[in-house]
């Protein structure tokens, strides 16, 4: 193992450097991984410019959240992976403390709150995946034993799908049911449509404003996908969504990104049957105004979901291994690690089932 490796590091906003860094030995609960492919978030450029209100790791740090790689070495307390294993790296780390609200971070990106516990956890695991080698907490590593025959450029699609997978699990979607997906033409929303079909939904109401993208989802995933083209007119949108759902939707997942209005979100809620559940994973920039009278009269649930449960990556990988989910539907554009800055520009243009990755 080389004593140094190449990595991109953020030293300050607008100060990104590609440099040689020391290759560490794995901590007792850590794993050293050779990165094969790392996902580039669509808003990574804004993060690096300081335009997103995140609690960034202490600088300098290596950015980047999810990746596919191979284990170089595992710490002495790690038993579920060993050298040579193909693995999925998740950035979602919870502090292992006896607390009702344990600290949470997204490695290489942000702490969910600026508490002393969260910032200490982030300082310990600050570096992400845009490097030749990553040192990762074992708790955030999932072995991909049954998927070792697939290329990293295909497996990196797991990184795009894991967030909506967590949301779909929170909805409690059951086989044969109808689900409404709001923001279906977006980066995560399109993945939710793909996943809902794989998870056995009887009907997936794909809500969005881009007819061509919605039609492409139906063409790709079949007649169970029902496009619902909305305009922002609350009354008309509600009628369109209800009609597409056939009046039978019990659950909905909202993945609308950076929305200036919650009108469509409310239309999706109102399209649910009595006792329905709406799961929020989007990033609306305005409050969601709920009517207590409506909520009580309809026994609705509105819940937030941050990321996914710890076992979710293994469950998602199992869908692929069993042939229920074909990752090749995700359209991956790759760049060499040295071309990371070009990859960031490309990622900003992604929509639908696109994904940008850097490969080593």
Segments from the language model and where they lie:
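C-terminal hydrophobic helical "lid"/dimerization subdomain
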Residues: 2-3, 166, 236, 266, ...
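Glycine-rich beta-strand-centered segment in the early N-terminal region that forms part
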Residues: 24-39, 52-105
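NAD(P)H dinucleotide-binding glycine-rich loop of Rossmann-like/cofactor-binding domains
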Residues: 94-179
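Mid-domain Rossmann-like dinucleotide-binding core that forms the NAD(H)/NADP(H) cofactor-binding site
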Residues: 140, 145-233
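Glycine-rich cofactor phosphate-binding loops and adjacent beta1-alpha1 units
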Residues: 197-205, 214-299
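Rossmann-fold dehydrogenase core element
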Residues: 277-279, 290-329
């Amino acid at each position: 193992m080389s004593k140094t490796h190449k990595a991109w590091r953020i030293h300050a906003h607008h100060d990104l450097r590609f440099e040689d860094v020391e290759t560490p030995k794995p901590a007792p609960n850590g794993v050293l991984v050779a990165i094969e492919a790392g996902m580039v978030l669509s808003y990574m450029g804004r993060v690096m410019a300081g335009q997103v209100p995140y609690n960034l790791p202490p600088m300098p740090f290596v950015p980047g959240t999810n990746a596919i790689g191979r284990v170089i070495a595992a710490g002495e307390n790690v038993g579920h992976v060993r050298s040579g294993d193909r693995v999925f790296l998740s950035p979602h780390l919870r502090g292992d403390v006896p607390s009702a609200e344990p600290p949470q971070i997204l490695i290489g990106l942000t702490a969910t709150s600026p508490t002393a516990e969260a910032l200490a956890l982030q300082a310990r695991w600050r570096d992400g995946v845009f490097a030749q080698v990553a040192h990762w907490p074992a708790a955030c590593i999932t072995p991909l034993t049954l998927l070792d025959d697939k290329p990293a450029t295909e497996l990196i699609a797991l990184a795009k799908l894991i967030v909506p997978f967590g949301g779909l699990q929170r909805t409690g979607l059951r086989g044969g049911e109808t689900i409404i997906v709001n923001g279906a033409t977006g980066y995560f929303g399109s993945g939710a449509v793909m996943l809902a079909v794989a998870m056995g939904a009887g009907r997936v109401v794909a809500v969005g404003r881009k007819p061509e993208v919605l039609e492409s989802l139906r063409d790709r995933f079949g007649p169970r996908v029902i496009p619902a083209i909305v305009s922002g007119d609350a009354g008309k949108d509600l009628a369109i969504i209800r009609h597409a759902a056939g009046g039978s939707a019990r659950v909905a997942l909202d993945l609308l990104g950076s929305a200036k209005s919650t009108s469509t979100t409310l239309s999706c809620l109102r399209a649910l049957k009595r006792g329905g559940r709406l799961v929020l994973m989007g990033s609306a920039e305005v409050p969601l105004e709920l009517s207590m009278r409506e909520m009580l009269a309809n026994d609705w649930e509105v819940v937030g979901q941050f990321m996914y449960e710890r076992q979710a990556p293994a469950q998602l990988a199992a869908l692929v291994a069993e042939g229920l989910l074909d990752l090749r539907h995700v359209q991956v554009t790759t760049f060499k690690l040295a071309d990371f800055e070009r990859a960031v520009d490309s990622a900003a243009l992604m929509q639908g089932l696109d994904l940008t990755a850097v490969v080593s």
